[in-house]
Amino acid sequence: MCAGTMKIISPSLTNSFFRCTLRFVACLFWIGYSQGTTHVLRFGGIFESVESGPSGAEELAFRFAVNTINRNRTLLPNTTITYDTQRINLYDSFEASRKACEQLSLGVAAIFGPSHSSSANAVQSICNALGVPHIQTRWKHQVSDNKDSFYVSLYPDFSSLSRAILDLVQFFKWKTVTIAYDDSTGLIRLQELIKAPSRYNLRLKIRQLPIDTKDAKPLLKEMKRGKEFHVIFDCSHDMAAGILKQALAMGMMTEYYHYIFTTLDLFALDVEPYRYSGVNMTGFRILNIENSQVLSIIEKWSMERLQAPPKPDSGLLDGFMTTDAALMYDAVHVASVAVQQFPQMTVSSLQCNRHKPWRFGARFINLIKEAHWEGLTGRITFNKTNGLRTDFDLDVISLKEEGLEKIGTWDPTSGLNMTDNQKGKPANITDSLSNRSLIVTTILEEPYVMFKKSDKPLYGKARFEGYCIDLLEKLSRILGFEYEVRLVEDGKYGAKDDSTQQWNGMVRELMDHKADLAVAPLAITYVREQVIDFTKPFMTLGIGILYRKPNGTNPGVFSFLNPLSPDIWMYILLAYLGVSCVLFVIARFSPYEWYNPHPCNPDSDVVENNFTLLNSFWFGVGALMQQGSELMPKALSTRIVGGIWWFFTLIIISSYTANLAAFLTVERMESPIDSADDLAKQTKIEYGAVQDGATMTFFKKSRIPTYEKMWAFMNSRSQSVLVKNNEEGIQRALTSDYAFLMESTTIEFVTQRNCNLTQIGGLIDSKGYGVGTPMGSPYRDKITIAILQLQEEGVLHMMKEKWWRGNGCPEEESKEASALGVQNIGGIFIVLAAGLVLSVFVAVGEFLYKSKKNAQLEKRSFCSAMVEELRMSLKCQRRLKHKPQPPVIVKTEEVINMHTFNDRRLPGKETMA
């Protein structure tokens, strides 16, 4: 029948059947050829989920990466990647091991995931045994003797990331840091930071976040109570999102708090509610969003991700690519780069119970470790020994009003490089203060802060006026902030109680963040700088002594002696005695001071000297009293003495006369104290300061003996000498024998308006008033710049003139004249002494010269003539002496005549030939 059938078939039908058969065989051949040239590899992925539901970001990124590689065909033109994904419960290591064995039995070139350590370690041990690469995108603790040779991790090495956090802490100059971690591995990850206190001046406090719940409010409450403003949170992004929401509800999202998050997903969090809170929030980002190709891939991812159901309460922006997703995307591409280098690689089914490793596994893992790829997270290279990613770039991001912005970079080689100040837009000091409302604490103190006098009721800041109020208004105009003025509750400036170690006053309110600024006469001191910050001083001053003015005393009966000091009076008396004696001696020695008392008888051999001892004293008195004495010196030496004495008396009398009028007309103000030393040496006059003020603290902390003694006095009588405020101290200084220690600027203000008070002595110390801010306040530097601007423009000086200038007290006609001392007119005594010495030398010269002339005249030796002259000069009571005569020749008749006329003396006219 068959043959018959064959026979009845026509040739045309036979040819058609033959052609169809050939075509069918050709198709089968092409399919077989195609299957032989197209390489197919399978990747396995194990992902964790809390419960059955939508796929997580890592699983979606894994599929997205595989599909992208297969679509583009650029990386693997002749290889098709397939995948097998499995889901397990969190921390289920047994289920993870079972799923890994299932995938290995199917034949996979590598296994990606799971994320958590316990499950990852179980899968890692299986991969090590069977020689299959295990690729991780989460941090896993690596022990020093790590033997996971088939392991690579794309997550940045946390020892490097810990150094990045430490560099950031040092850049911000933090002194106290709190670390809050969510599991025990956080202490391992942050080991570089935990070791920091031993190497840096850093105080570290470590707290653990709640494990079984996301309620962090109890922990945040403890941080707020402990004033922990610098906190590092080591937690997942969903935990970070919950912490931010709870911190906002607790009032911990202010400019005084600064948070650093270790999660690399900070950029993906919804920070819209916190943009204008003023909180400082810093973190790191590894996703290279500045690359246009990366942005293109993220856009495609976002489009596909938005089609998937969003994960509830994740805290992430919908469709935003997380770091885990980006790392998984890069991990698939890195494995594909290794596949490209090993095209002949094939996979085989592996059984967990046989322990027969994959023959291509060792080479494949080495190719993965040697791979280089510029991915979504930057450059990717591995340490060939441990498979860790140690070379990477991080962007430092910070919360601004525009959102999270890049402010710097960090890499393991160069470290931290902050670029926030190098942006295109210029820095503006009003950026952090514009349109903000600040609480300002102050204290009533004239003329700084006072209640404004008005007939109408005043409210708010309009109730106050004064220097500090004007300063606050100027600052608000420059910086653009609003403010509310509140008086400090306890009425104190701020001091530390030694027994309780607690602060009070305005300092306490700043420490408790009840106020943003303290604008008052608040002195900048060392102890206050330990707990709060200060701006540069807007006023410099010191501690002075306020005391009532002493009563004036009328000039006394003997006030005419006051123009010259007692020393000068004594020196004048000694000078008078000395000059008189010198004049007497010189007049006796000088031959030219002897004269003929009978001018009509020029032949008389008797000469006379007017300068007896009494006459010499009389001559000195006459010159001193500006009167004549009828005694005129004739010799040059005596005239020198007289002239120099007259010059001396001229200066003395002129000085005395000039100073006498002041002493006779001015009421002398005699004060019992003139300085702090005078106060310390006595106990009759009480003295004190404002309790718990900067002045009291100065004496309390001083180590200068005088001030220590003063503090001992004040401390022993603290109930009576320490006052509550300046007004009480001023009133006590007016009404009792009390010296009030206070700031010099306030003393200046008080003495301008109360003429019965005055400042005693100079300043005891030097300090300044500054605007106080809480520790670490971002406003301090901005306010400092504004204060310097006001200072340079002269505004601060004009404000001081406005509030300090009063009616003024009537000026005294003249100040008390001080007695002239040796330093004033001592030179005239030197001139007097020089004149006396000169006159002595001249007198000696005259004496020698005259002795020589007499020796020649009397024809005898020079020595005998000098002795004779000296003998006659030393006869102090004699005014007469014989003139020297030449020898004469006497004739006989003249002798007879002499006997006859015995009442006449020898004329002695003839001389020997």
Curated annotation (Swiss-Prot):
Cystine crosslinks: C101-C352, C755-C809
GO cellular component: kainate selective glutamate receptor complex; plasma membrane; postsynaptic density membrane; presynaptic membrane
Molecular function via GO: extracellularly glutamate-gated ion channel activity; glutamate-gated calcium ion channel activity; glutamate-gated receptor activity; kainate selective glutamate receptor activity; transmitter-gated monoatomic ion channel activity involved in regulation of postsynaptic membrane potential
Mode of membrane association: Multi-pass membrane protein
Organism superkingdom: Eukaryota
Pfam families: ANF_receptor, Lig_chan, Lig_chan-Glu_bd
Glycosylation sites: N72, N78, N280, N383, N417, N428, N435, N551, N756
Regulation: Cold receptor activity activated by temperatures between 10-19 degrees Celsius.
Residue runs in coiled coils: none
Location, primary (coarse class): membrane
Topological domains, Extracellular: 1-566, 665-824
Oligomeric form and interacting partners: Homotetramer and heterotetramer with GRIK5. Tetramers may be formed by the dimerization of dimers.
Family statement: Belongs to the glutamate-gated ion channel (TC 1.A.10.1) family. GRIK2 subfamily.
Protein name: Glutamate receptor ionotropic, kainate 2
Protein's organism: Xenopus laevis (African clawed frog)
Name of the encoding gene: grik2
